[in-house]
């Protein structure tokens, strides 16, 4: 099924985006990413190692693959920090596709500070960045981010790394209805069925890291996520049947043997 995910000027053949944290080494990160079929991997700017070419670099590990890098501003708590981070990153790498995240609660929930995120988005969009904005599952804030110049909205399903799955499915639907941008469900995905559910709700894609990296068999989970996202997307596009309170016979009664 040819169904490209378009984010700004970029087109991706896979609707699954993966993270790069929590793996034992860069090689395992690469193997799991390739098993997932993802064409986009998000990585904290500090792990891109843009200041010391003599240290191990994740980008070198992925040379020769079709995987693109999505730098993120993990650890930033103000708009100014995120803006500076991405300016330096683009200057060093030429990468303009970014995952903007400004964290409001760094101790317990890792929930985003959406007000600071909007401030950063307004400035970075004017500077030509292609912005995928991590946010809460609030449809009003999603619309504000669209107005601020975001190219994709990334609402959380649940707290980062929690594995709780989609806690507010109606909010994901409301966000999908509120914006005319790709909606990528981000954070809280725990297993393949969570990813499929997100896609069935109408999400344009899913981002997951911990569910793969923390699985007992990361390679198998990566492949499961690949198929789950495809299946969920196909299910959504197919159009599910209406829910009814009573049974509906699937076989006609005409022609039955008369007793």
UniProtKB/Swiss-Prot annotation:
PANTHER family: THIAZOLE SYNTHASE (PTHR34266:SF2)
Active site: 99 (schiff-base intermediate with dxp)
A molecular function (GO) term: thiazole synthase activity
Reaction catalyzed: [ThiS sulfur-carrier protein]-C-terminal-Gly-aminoethanethioate + 2-iminoacetate + 1-deoxy-D-xylulose 5-phosphate = [ThiS sulfur-carrier protein]-C-terminal Gly-Gly + 2-[(2R,5Z)-2-carboxy-4-methylthiazol-5(2H)-ylidene]ethyl phosphate + 2 H2O + H(+)
Pathway: Cofactor biosynthesis; thiamine diphosphate biosynthesis
Record CDD domains: ThiG
Domain of life, per lineage: Bacteria
Organism: Sulfurimonas denitrificans (strain ATCC 33889 / DSM 1251) (Thiomicrospira denitrificans (strain ATCC 33889 / DSM 1251))
Record protein name field: Thiazole synthase
Gene Ontology biological process terms from the UniProt entry: thiamine diphosphate biosynthetic process
Gene this chain is encoded by: thiG
Compartments, record wording: Cytoplasm
Keywords: Cytoplasm, Schiff base, Thiamine biosynthesis, Transferase
Binding site for 1-deoxy-D-xylulose 5-phosphate: 161, 187-188, 209-210
GO cellular component, one term: cytoplasm
Enzyme Commission number, as recorded: 2.8.1.10
Coiled-coil regions, chain positions: none
Transmembrane segments: none
């Amino acid at each position: 099924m040819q169904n490209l995910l378009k984010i700004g000027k970029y087109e991706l053949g896979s609707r699954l985006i993966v993270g790069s944290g929590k793996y034992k080494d860069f090689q395992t990160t690469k193997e799991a990413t390739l098993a997932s079929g993802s064409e986009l991997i998000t990585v904290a700017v500090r792990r891109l190692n843009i200041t010391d070419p003599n240290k191990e670099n994740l980008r070198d590990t992925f040379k020769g693959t079709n995987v693109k890098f999505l730098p993120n501003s993990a650890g930033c708590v103000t708009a100014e920090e995120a803006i500076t981070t991405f300016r330096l990153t683009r200057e060093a790498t030429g990468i303009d596709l970014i995952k903007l995240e400004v964290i409001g609660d760094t101790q317990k929930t890792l929930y985003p500070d959406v007000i600071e995120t909007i401030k950063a988005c307004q400035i970075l969009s004017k500077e030509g960045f292609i912005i995928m904005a991590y946010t809460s599952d609030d449809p009003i804030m999603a619309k504000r981010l669209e107005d601020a110049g975001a190219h994709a909205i990334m609402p959380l399903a649940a707290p980062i790394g929690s594995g709780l799955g989609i806690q507010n499915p109606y909010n994901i639907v409301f966000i999908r209805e509120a914006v005319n941008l790709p909606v990528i469900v981000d954070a809280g995905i725990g297993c393949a069925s969570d990813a499929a559910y997100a896609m069935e709700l109408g999400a344009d894609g899913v981002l997951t890291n911990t569910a793969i990296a923390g699985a007992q068999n990361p390679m198998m989970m990566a492949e499961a996520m690949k198929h789950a996202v495809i299946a969920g997307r196909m299910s959504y596009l197919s159009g599910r049947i209406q829910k009814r309170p009573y049974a509906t016979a699937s076989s006609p009664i005409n022609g039955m043997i008369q007793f």
